[in-house]
UniProtKB/Swiss-Prot annotation:
Residue segments, region Disordered: 1-137, 700-769
Annotated organism of origin: Aspergillus terreus (strain NIH 2624 / FGSC A1156)
Identification of the protein by name: ATP-dependent RNA helicase dbp7
Cellular compartments annotated: Nucleus, Nucleolus
Remarks, miscellaneous: Present with 1460 molecules/cell in log phase SD medium.
Chain location of the short sequence motif DEAD box per the record: 318-321
Length: 769
């Protein structure tokens, strides 16, 4: 086609022509995106700086009349991360700045689940005081002398120990064990005096060896040359096994009190945590009665030649169910086999030809029956006579899972939401110790050792963070504090103390060194002022702590039997006592039916406590008042606690570690009760509020394990070394900054954890013993 000479002109605006943009290469996609946004921001035309630019038109398609100008924007805070992302000038600096996770502060009294079960109406008529079921008998004919004890021992019980009459289980067991030499299984409720039930016949039998029946002077304990017939060199006659070190210490104290009327009989203890060298020295000197834990006794039977068990004629297994639960089955089998193999005829007249085994337990479960089949032969079952316990009570059918609580124990439960657990506990303790003398001692049971440490720091935080003036004023009192103060196990409970009634707080769990556990427990028992013990189940078995008026189960026990032993720390030997258990709304409310099974009357004495009433009494004072000041006070206390946790990294780590350990412990309930403690129905976000945490549960993570017993003991010794002026020596002659030392420590810790998994039960993971 020929060219016709036409020329076409097209007009385009400047916006149509697209400028070529350089393509960014290299780096990460975040860097490329950041550079692209910066380039786009620079390419935009800048606004005039004189401020005369025309206002931006406001789109108003509906023709709505707008009065006034647009209100000013609020000032951006640090939490407005979305607005900060729009600032392109900071795009290059965002990757170098530390971004804190956004915290959501929830309200204590919003979105809390309601209890499923309605509160049952209570009778307005005052309930009659129940007759104690574990008190000493008041019948004057039932004295210790009538049961077969010698006048010397009976007079010692009356004058020195102030025991006028035996309890029901002591009446049944003493007469039976003194009459026959067969094996026995003693079953009685907690706090009824089982320790004396087997110690009194034991001491009576050994005292009888000192004066045989063919002697003319039966009251004499010496031979013709003036020497005792039975002394510490005569041999070991009896062994008492207990599951925990604290129970062994208590049995030893009771036994030493009995033996003050028979000074020639020597008793001793061998328990874990003590120096084996000192124990071997005591064994070489000679003992007649030995109180021990199974693990340490098995070790001495294997490695200590000075331990002669050829004359052992009495073996007592105290708290048999706990011995099996803690995984001592293999140790007990080995101990029984070695005692049978090493038994020899005794040269001392009056010593029985065969060994008598006594098994004691408050419950009759399958593991106890298994232990009985392993250790007992043709055993007799000793139980308290129901007529002696309570004439009006009807005995229940024997059941493996049945357990009974003392009739005089006043037990209640509170349905508390997860977010309100900590403030409710604080309010209850505030109200309990408001007046001096109302409650002398209380025990708070929690599920794990990390939770014990956290709550101890929470309730004593103001004392430890006091100013220098307060420290100077208390400088004169530090010399009189017990040794446990140096390991931070005893402090003033500032969270619920008041000037008229100061309260001392103690903490106890299985990860503490043995000497610290012993001194802390002794301080709590000897303290004459108001005291509170926060502990795990290490203090729930067999301990007879004086003047314990209240037991609080902040975390429910792992089984009904553990619950029985927990509340058994109060209402002992006929004294009154109270117990309170915290339950969450939902499936945990079904645990009330299990609590009712422990009562002879079907749970009529079990009462329900309203959580709001506890908060009103603790933070407000008047329950019937409609004022909501108590909510503000509880919220202020919770907010102050959360700020304390955020200000200190060590406090935040402690709270997170306690939160994680609590959840792990929550999943270890027995199978029969796991439907009531279902971890899938546990609101983890609300539960974090009870540990002063504002983080989301998915962001709460604490790597590593908590310090064990050995690590805590090493730190304790390291802290004492500079004070004593001694230079700490490193193992192998290495310096402190030697690199292989860290590797050796890590490998040793790994081996220790592997060994603990092989030899310890599942409950030991949470430092229960």
């Amino acid at each position: 086609m020929a060219d016709d000479g036409m020329l076409l002109n097209f007009t385009f605006s400047d916006d149509v022509v697209k400028k070529s943009e350089p393509k960014l290469k290299g780096g990460t996609w975040r860097d490329r995106l950041s550079a692209k946004k910066i380039a786009q921001h620079r390419a935009q035309p800048r606004k005039p700086s004189d401020g005369t630019a025309a206002p931006r038109p406001v789109k108003n398609p509906n023709r709505i009349q707008v009065s006034g100008t647009r209100p000013a924007k609020r000032q951006r805070t640090d939490d407005d991360h979305d607005a900060g992302l729009r600032d392109h000038d900071r795009a290059g600096q965002s990757q170098h700045q530390h971004q804190h996770p956004r915290q959501f502060i929830s309200s204590l009294f919003s979105k809390n689940p309601l209890p499923r079960n309605a509160e049952e109406p209570t009778d307005e008529a005052p309930a009659e005081d129940a007759k104690p079921t574990n008190a000493p008998l008041i019948d004057g004919l039932d004295t210790f002398t009538n049961l077969g004890l010698s006048p010397t021992l009976a007079a010692h019980l009356l004058t020195k120990l102030e025991l006028k009459a035996p309890t029901a289980i002591q009446k049944a067991s003493i007469s039976q064990l003194l009459k026959e030499e067969s094996d026995a299984f003693i079953q009685a409720e907690t706090g009824s005096g089982k320790t004396l039930a087997y110690l009194l016949p034991l001491v009576q039998r050994i005292m009888a060896l000192s004066h045989p029946t063919n002697r003319t002077d039966a009251t004499s304990t010496t031979d013709a040359e003036g020497q005792p017939v039975v002394h510490r060199d005569s041999g070991l006659f009896a062994i008492v096994l207990a599951p925990t070190r604290e129970l062994c210490k208590q049995i030893s104290v009771v036994l030493e009190g009995l033996l003050r009327c028979a000074h020639w009989i020597v008793a001793g203890t061998v328990i874990g945590g003590e120096k084996k060298k000192s124990e071997k020295a005591r064994l070489r000197k000679g003992l007649n009665i030995l109180v021990a834990t199974p693990g340490r006794l098995a070790d001495h039977l294997e490695n200590t030649q000075a331990l002669d068990v050829s004359n052992v004629r009495w073996l007592v297994l105290d708290e048999g169910d706990r011995l099996m639960e803690l995984g001592f089955e293999q140790e007990l089998q080995g101990i029984i086999k070695k005692l049978d193999a090493r038994q020899r005829p005794s040269r001392i007249p009056g010593v029985p030809t065969k060994r008598t085994t006594i098994l004691c337990s408050a419950t009759l479960k399958m593991n106890v029956q298994k232990l009985g089949e392993m250790s007992l032969k043709d055993a007799i079952h000793i139980k308290a006579d129901p007529a002696d316990e309570d004439g009006d009570a009807k005995p229940k059918n024997d059941d493996e899972s049945a357990f009974t609580v003392p009739a005089q124990l006043k037990q209640s439960y509170a349905i508390v939401a997860a977010k309100l657990r900590l403030v409710t506990l604080t309010a209850f303790l505030k109200r309990t110790f408001m007046r001096k003398g109302s409650v002398m001692k209380a025990i708070v049971f929690v599920s794990c050792a990390d939770s014990v440490d956290f709550h101890f720091e929470v309730f004593t935080r103001k004392l430890q963070d006091s100013d220098e003036n307060a420290e100077d004023s208390d400088a004169s009192d530090t010399k009189e504090k017990p040794a446990a103060f140096t390991h931070n196990t005893i402090a003033r409970a500032t969270a619920f103390s008041n000037p008229s009634n100061p309260v001392t707080l103690h903490r106890l769990h299985g990860s503490l060194p043995q000497h610290v556990r012993t001194s802390t427990l002794a301080s709590f028992a000897r303290n004459k002022d108001a005291s509170v013990l926060v502990c795990t189940d290490v203090a729930s078995r067999g301990l007879d702590l004086p003047n314990v008026d209240l037991v609080i189960e902040y975390d429910p026990a792992f089984s009904a039997e553990d619950h029985l032993h927990r509340i058994g720390r109060t209402a002992r030997l006929g004294r009154d006592g109270r117990a309170l258990i915290f339950l969450q709304p939902g499936c945990e409310e079904g645990y009330v039916e299990i609590l009712k099974r422990g009562y002879r009357d079907g749970g009529k004495a079990l009462t329900r406590t309203n959580a709001d009433d506890i908060l009103k009494r603790g933070f407000g004072g008047n329950v019937e008042s409609e004022n909501k000041d108590w909510e503000e006070k509880a919220t202020d206390w919770q907010m102050d606690l959360e700020r304390w946790a955020l200000e200190k990294p060590e406090s935040l780590e402690m709270a997170r570690r306690a939160y994680q350990s609590h959840i792990r412990a929550y999943a270890t309930h027995v199978a029969s009760e796991r439907s009531m403690f279902n971890i899938k129905e546990l609101h983890l976000g609300h539960l974090a509020k009870a540990f002063a945490l504002r983080d989301r549960p998915s962001k709460i993570n604490v790597p590593g394990l908590r310090q064990g017993k050995d690590d805590t003991k090493k730190d304790y010794k390291a802290a004492r070394a500079p004070a004593a002026g001694k230079k700490r020596k490193t193992p192998g002659g290495r310096d402190d900054d030697d690199i292989p030392a860290a590797a050796d420590t890590a490998s040793a810790a790994q081996k220790m954890r592997a060994k603990m998994k092989e030899h310890m039960a599942g409950a030991s993971e949470f430092n229960l013993a």
